Amino acid sequence: MRVLKNILSQLHVYLVWLILGAVGWGFIFGIVTDAPAEKKLVLFAEVESIRDRELAVRLEENKPRGIRLVQVHSFDYVMFDEAGLLNADLYIVPAGSVETYRDSFLPLDADKLPPDTPELLELEGGACGIRVWDGEQGCAASYIDYGEGEYYLFLGANSLHAGETDDAAYWLIEAFLKLE
């Protein structure tokens, strides 16, 4: 009885250690399983809901050489990783949010897009976004609940994979457009 009383009197200490241990191991696991920015592709989506893990696994199939990881996040994830949002390779946003994020987008290189690319959104005279949801149907509908209205896919302005020497972001665009 005395041992039980002693344990219960120190329960708060045990709980604090338990929480710190879980957070610490979660942090270590994140570091071990993550990849450097040069070796991962990141897609952020401002959608109703997204099956992010399933979509990431599907997009990782046949990934380009040099890419170790594809991450998919909803915009809700921003509270944990604002820098990740700013450096994302691709964004999916509703038509109503395009103006809000327009400084985060790069113009698309039409020569690197697949020939069957859906309708393009023009901003300031150049192709900038690809319509991936028209309000009723579109790309990756089995992974994403888009919500009302049209949604567009954009190339991130800070993407490390959209330059002349590395076009893995265009591979990710093509892989995403093929999903149903």
Show where each model-derived region lies.
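Short, surface-exposed patches at the edges or C-terminal ends of soluble domains, predominantly
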Residues: 34, 157-163, 177-178
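Solvent-exposed, polar/charged alpha-helical surfaces in well-ordered, non-transmembrane soluble domains
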Residues: 57, 81, 99, 170-174
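Extracytoplasmic "Venus flytrap"/periplasmic binding protein-like
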Residues: 78-131
